[in-house]
Amino acid sequence: MKRHFLSVIFLLTTFCSVAQTVPVKKELAAVRAAIVPKIDGILTDEVWSGVAVATDFVENRPVPGRHEVKAQRTEIQVLYDDNAIYVAARMYDAPDSVVQELVSRDNIGNADFIGLIFDTFSDGMNGNGFYVTAAGVQFDAKYSQVG
């Protein structure tokens, strides 16, 4: 009886572990820029052509974990050179649904925003975050295991 019980438990745990999917780790390789991109908010500069595009993001706010919908998708490209990291971001949304709120620096408020966190120690625990809202308010943060 005990042997059958252990066999059933083993089979159940095996099925449960197979049923759980491990999320795929997404990575975007930055491309070394041959020339400095023009910083004007218009992403038609030739330097961006052929650079890999990151898509299929997951929301943090207002619904954590919700996958983006095509009509409100975000596309990111990253370049770098000896002096800077350049990020191109295209955020698709109906203009009348973009939430803008003019607040002080380092205060995101309830506005729509985009941010990047660089895992500068490559340890998954420490990093530096840079954010900007739809109204142009900037926010930066340092993340660590100890707060």
Q: What is each stretch, according to the model?
A:
Residues 2-11:
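Sec-dependent signal peptide recognition
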Residues 14-16:
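N-terminal signal peptide c-region/cleavage motif recognized by signal peptidases
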